[in-house]
């Protein structure tokens, strides 16, 4: 949480932290500015003191809404500095930072964070090391200050996540109702029984994705990563987004993975349901029941303070007890259980904590954390895959709550 930033600075022995970027491209900037639209800002944080937001004069009104101390970037005008340095923009950015830190009396260990192309970031950090005589430039690769702070959410963040969850679940409910309302046509000329669109033509994945988009517009949601609506063998490849030309055939496994956020950015929701229209093949039904059993087992055993990697091991061992291959004993397998169980969720679709079972993963389940639970089985050669995914919140009392109330029924009824 934001209230932990001073503690995290102290734990890292940092005298200050500098964050660069824009609300739209840097989750850390969005986090610190409460999502107010700002571009190309510099944020200076020092223990026990208000944060300083250095911003373009054109954005002074939005900057004032953040509650931070504000300063106009023209006080350290980058163009003027670049002219002094004969047009060397890299040297100018480093010199601008030197002047800012000097004016605020910052010296010692300073961590640098934000967003940028890797080459540009490396060049700037290297130049800063050369330019900042009184500063030790500190960078973090894993579990950095703000990644760690964002693992736990405060009441305002949870309210935002509940809000986007409600809207996302409304979209999924509307889609399920639409699919169930469509009549089915008997197969002909080699095609199988499938749903019909309102114009009497076959309903396709393209139609479904357009419907999802329209529902998102109504709910004020956007899908920066698209969505997954994959049928049959495509559902057997976890991140296959689906073939737009595919017909909505009865009895085929459908994986619908939906991960929207509010228009303009904000907190994500992430949910997956597996459906079969009208009826389900026995093999799909069995895989679904086994996956539902894993999901319930994980939910029943969630515990504050327990290593997150333990839940990946629990999942693999349960699936293996049912003779499914998993990545625990068959690394690289493309059938069976092939991915991680869960991931943190927030301003990014994948964030800390990690639930992967590797030696260096020391993450534990924490109060205030929000994460997915998403076991699944994949058999592209057999023409199906199944996955079930909810978003889970651990409250301050250590109780766990699903933020994804939409039913987990495999079968979607269709009109006769």
Stretches with model-predicted labels:
Residues 1-416:
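Active-site neighborhoods and metal-handling regions in enzymes and metal-associated proteins
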């Amino acid at each position: 949480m934001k209230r932990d930033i001073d503690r995290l600075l102290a734990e890292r022995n940092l005298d200050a932290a500098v964050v660069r970027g824009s609300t739209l491209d840097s989750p850390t900037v969005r986090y610190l500015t409460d999502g107010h639209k700002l571009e190309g800002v510099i944020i200076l944080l020092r223990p026990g003191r208000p944060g300083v937001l250095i911003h373009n004069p054109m954005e002074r009104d939005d900057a004032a809404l953040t509650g931070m101390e504000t300063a106009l970037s023209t006080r350290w005008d980058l163009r003027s500095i670049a002219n002094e340095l004969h047009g060397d923009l890299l040297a100018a950015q480093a010199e601008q930072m030197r002047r800012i830190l000097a004016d605020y009396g910052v010296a010692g260990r300073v961590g640098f964070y934000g967003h940028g192309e890797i080459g540009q970031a490396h060049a700037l950090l290297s130049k800063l090391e050369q330019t900042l005589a009184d500063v030790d430039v500190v960078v973090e690769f894993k579990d950095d200050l703000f990644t760690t702070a964002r693992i736990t959410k405060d009441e305002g963040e949870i309210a935002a996540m509940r809000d986007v969850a409600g809207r996302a679940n409304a979209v999924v409910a509307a889609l399920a109702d639409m699919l169930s309302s469509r009549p089915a046509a008997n197969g002909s000329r080699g095609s199988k029984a499938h749903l019909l669109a309102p114009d009497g033509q076959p309903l396709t994945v393209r139609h479904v994705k357009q419907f999802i988009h329209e529902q998102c517009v109504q709910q004020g949601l956007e899908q920066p990563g698209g969505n997954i609506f994959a049928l049959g063998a495509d559902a057997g490849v976890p991140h296959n987004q689906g073939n737009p030309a595919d017909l909505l055939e009865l009895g085929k496994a459908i994986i619908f993975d939906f991960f929207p956020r509010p228009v303009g950015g904000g907190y994500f929701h992430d949910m997956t349901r597996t459906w079969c229209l009208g009826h389900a093949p026995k093999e799909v039904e069995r895989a679904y029941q086994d996956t539902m059993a894993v999901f319930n087992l994980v939910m029943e055993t969630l515990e504050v303070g327990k290593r997150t990697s333990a839940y990946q091991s629990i999942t693999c061992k349960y699936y293996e007890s049912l003779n499914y291959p998993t990545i625990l004993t068959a690394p690289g397998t493309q059938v069976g259980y092939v991915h991680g169980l869960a991931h943190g969720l927030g301003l990014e679709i994948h964030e800390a904590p990690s639930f992967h079972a590797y030696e260096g993963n020391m993450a534990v389940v924490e109060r205030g954390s929000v994460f997915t639970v998403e076991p699944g089985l994949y058999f592209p050669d057999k023409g199906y895959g199944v996955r079930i995914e909810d978003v889970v919140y651990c409250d301050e009392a250590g109780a766990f709550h699903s933020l994804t109330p939409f039913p987990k029924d495999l079968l979607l009824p269709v009109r006769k």
